């Protein structure tokens, strides 16, 4: 099989960035390349289309990596997606469709079936692409998880993938992390580690050269390059609550407060707002932070009922009502839209034991959770502008007689609600919404163009600072023969 595993010394070492940049660099060379991550844990997901034409759910990061690879996103690129819920259990998405729920205690029992499905997905993907760039998860040297690993070196063993390890030098201790990562692996797994990539280096790379030479001498493995720290690199986040590509707000900018729900999901919905020069977008978690907000966004959540209870416990419900009474706009997206309605019912226990609660009553709609998840890519118009988005939800909305239709959602005065994620990424739609809600003139900012420019920038950095020719050759030829063993090896 032709492919490469990008592992990391730790979480957030830069695996996603390196994988994404490699996908763009190889695609620009005319290589038919696909991204892959056996298992992702994130509440930031995206809808794509499965082979039967139905909607399917994958991690947002793998969707962006597919864009970087200029490939069509599909479930095989992220066969297992874990979405943390409200009760220390995770909802499992397998090949784009709901599979069940697991807790840490019963995870071991279901892992074998998921591993088989994930590896079959890789094999099928590899049969259709010249190169598959696989991203690992966390670190490959988590000793307590080694036995059931199918995401890192478990995948590399299955597919015979050479592996490069990424380390974040900005944190410090990267040389110890590189050496220790290899030294804690079994001889079989050490043989798969071809070398290293240094990430987020600041300063003169010549000063780093002696350390890199020593690392190569001590490990018998090469360093494939050093990526510099760059302020303009942003990717759709998997877990960290941050605004991708956020720019400094101009003087007099309108303040947008995004309520920081404990189980917030798909918060990438507000990334496009963060690019607008006339907006200052912040996350808010207490009533006082809404006092000076011009627009409040109530985002999606993995646990609508539980997060609504949290919102009330913090007094944010009263703050929202004061905001609306002052004539200022609120936008609810998916779970946030459901909270704005009159009632939320859960007769099938989709979210837990609570059968139903009253909503905030700011929109004349009711929500009932059904047992089947809706996954689709709708399109329509909003304020005369073309609108597209994606839906990931169990809630079915019933509208009252006095509510104007808004996409598939509702509007009452300055309170807006929609079940569509991603709608604000449309430039014309976003401009018209901001004009309607805040009186903000169109800025001319293009979110899709900004994302594409960042993917090109990441590809440029990979081309300039990594040995892409050597990495491509490695992916095509397989693990390097004759690599030395570093004691002590796996315990």
Curated annotation (Swiss-Prot):
One of its GO terms (biological process) is cobalamin biosynthetic process. It comes from the Bacteria. The active site is at residues 334, 421. Transmembrane segments: none annotated. The keyword Plastid does not apply. It holds the Pfam family GATase_3. One of its GO terms (molecular function) is catalytic activity. Gene3D superfamilies: 3.40.50.880, P-loop containing nucleotide triphosphate hydrolases. Keywords: Cobalamin biosynthesis, Glutamine amidotransferase. Residues 253-429 form the GATase cobBQ-type domain. InterPro entries: Class_I_gatase-like, CobQ/CobB/MinD/ParA_Nub-bd_dom, CobQ_GATase1, CobQ_N, CobQ_synth, GATase_3, P-loop_NTPase. Pathway: Cofactor biosynthesis; adenosylcobalamin biosynthesis. Disulfide bonds: none annotated. Catalyzes amidations at positions B, D, E, and G on adenosylcobyrinic A,C-diamide. NH(2) groups are provided by glutamine, and one molecule of ATP is hydrogenolyzed for each amidation. Belongs to the CobB/CobQ family. CobQ subfamily. This is Cobyric acid synthase. The gene is cobQ.
């Amino acid at each position: 099989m032709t492919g490469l595993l990008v592992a990391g010394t730790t979480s957030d070492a830069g695996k996603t960035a390196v994988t994404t940049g490699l996908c763009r660099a190889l695609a620009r060379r005319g290589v038919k390349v696909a991204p892959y991550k056996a298992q992702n844990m994130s509440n930031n997901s995206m809808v794509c289309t499965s082979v039967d034409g139905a909607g399917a759910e994958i991690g947002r990061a793998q969707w962006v990596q597919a864009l970087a690879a200029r490939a069509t996103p599909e479930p095989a690129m992220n066969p297992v997606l874990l979405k943390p819920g409200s009760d220390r259990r995770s909802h499992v998405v397998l090949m784009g469709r709901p599979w069940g729920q697991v807790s840490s205690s019963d995870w071991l029992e279901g892992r074998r079936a998921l591993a088989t499905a994930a590896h079959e997905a890789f094999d099928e993907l590899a049969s259709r692409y010249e190169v598959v760039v696989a991203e690992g998860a966390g670190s490959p040297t988590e000793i307590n998880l080694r036995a059931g690993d199918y995401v890192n070196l478990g995948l590399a063993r299955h597919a015979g993938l050479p592996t490069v390890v990424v380390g974040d030098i900005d944190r410090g201790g990267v040389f110890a992390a590189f050496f220790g990562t290899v030294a804690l692996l079994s001889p079989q797994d050490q043989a798969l580690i071809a070398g290293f990539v240094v990430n987020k280096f600041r300063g003169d790379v010549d000063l780093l050269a002696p350390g890199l030479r020593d690392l190569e001498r001590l490990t018998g493995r090469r360093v494939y390059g050093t990526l510099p720290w760059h302020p303009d690199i942003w990717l759709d986040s998997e877990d960290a609550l941050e605004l991708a590509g956020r720019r400094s707000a101009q003087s007099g900018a309108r303040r947008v407060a995004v309520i920081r729900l404990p189980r917030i999901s798909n918060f990438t919905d507000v990334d496009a707002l963060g690019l607008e020069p006339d907006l200052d977008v912040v996350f808010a978690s207490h009533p006082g932070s809404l006092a000076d907000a011009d627009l409040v966004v109530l985002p999606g959540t993995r646990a609508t009922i539980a997060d609504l209870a949290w919102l009330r416990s913090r007094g944010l419900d009263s703050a929202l009502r004061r905001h609306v009474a002052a004539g200022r706009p609120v936008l609810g997206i998916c779970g946030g839209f459901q909270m704005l309605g009159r009632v939320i019912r859960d007769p099938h226990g989709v979210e837990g034991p609570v059968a139903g609660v009253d909503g905030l009553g700011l929109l004349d709609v009711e929500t009932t959770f059904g047992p089947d998840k809706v996954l689709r890519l709708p399109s329509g118009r909003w304020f005369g502008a073309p609108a597209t988005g994606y839906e990931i939800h169990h809630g079915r909305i019933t509208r009252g007689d006095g509510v104007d239709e808004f996409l598939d959602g509702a509007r009452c005065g300055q309170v807006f609600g929609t079940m569509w994620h991603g709608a604000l990424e449309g430039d014309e739609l976003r401009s018209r919404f901001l004009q309607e809600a805040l009186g903000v003139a169109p800025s001319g900012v293009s979110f899709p163009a900004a994302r594409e420019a960042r993917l090109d920038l990441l590809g440029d950095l990979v081309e300039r600072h990594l040995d892409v020719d050597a990495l491509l050759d490695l992916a095509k030829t397989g693990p390097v023969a004759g690599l030395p063993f570093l004691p002590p090896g796996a315990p």
